[in-house]
Amino acid sequence: IANDDYMVTGYYKVGNSTYYFDENGLMKTGWFKINGEDYYAASSGAIQAQWVKSLSNWYYVDVDGKMVTGYQTINGAKYYFASSGLMQKDWFKINGEDYYAASSGTIQAQWVKSGRNWYYVDTDGKMVTGDYIIDGEVNRFDNQGLWMNQIN
């Protein structure tokens, strides 16, 4: 109930913090749904852009508390979140294609060593195949992404 003795629903700002109240006027905390979409509010009820750890998995919610999916740039770093909202790390697939993100979840063009083999992923984290230019040099990768050699 707000100061005017009426029940608030939806987003409501108090001071510098925003909160979400359901149809019964109850402040939401933790994970909750709005129109079938996943949202998150801190234990205080405050809604803000933030990382959320659930068990050993990481998720990110935007300024409205909505769980993000797909590619996101957060504090200058690129990440990919599955349709479940789960931050991807290490090797993962998008539409059957192989992608890689560091164990921190960050995505960038880089060499990746797996066992004794080397692979290269582009700025979207996608594993390259065929001939691919890296630092001005043409490198050859097989159809599984395994680095074969540098072509002079």
Segments from the language model and where they lie:
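Extracellular adhesion/carbohydrate-binding repeat motifs centered on closely spaced tryptophans
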Residues: 1-152
